[in-house]
Amino acid sequence: MCSSDLRHEGIGATDDAMGRLAEILLKESAAKTLGDMDNPAQTFGFDVQLLGEKTSFGLGEEIRFFIESDRDGYVTLVDLGTDGTVAMLLPNADDRSMRIRAGQRLEYPGEDLVFQALEPAGGGLVRAFITEEPLDIELASPQDVYRAGGAEFAAEITEALKRAAGLDGNAVRLNSWGTASVVYEITN
């Protein structure tokens, strides 16, 4: 079998195509890092749901999150989007730290803002974290409100979450943070 037989028709090996592929793989790696971040020792209730407990949205439909916790803390909300981009929804330039009280049902965004399902269609995941301290992380500029990126940004969020949860030596304290997630789909 010659090397040309290994290439699938329609997939080029140009520098541009390889660059796009590398970008996609980096974004997917970043999303996986945050998507896999879990606390197996979590002993308190913490939940994130979508408006109407829906998980599938058509383009242009409203998306709203509801977060509940059995413990006081600060909420971090990260969207691992349908295009592989990691977007930090909370905290952001407008809401620098989002405090939740035990038993409270937090709605985000509030009534003054609407999130809509946007292209590309596909699957995504929203991961919510609760920590005793707010995240110490560079936020987006006021013009941008939300900060987004790929692998480097995901690593930055992960490190900020570890610091906010607290460390015992090099290990993250397991009793100081929690996480919840919801998988969603955007359809055409």
Residue ranges with predicted function:
Residues 4-188:
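Secretory-pathway glycoprotein ectodomains that are cysteine- and/or Ser/Thr/Pro-rich
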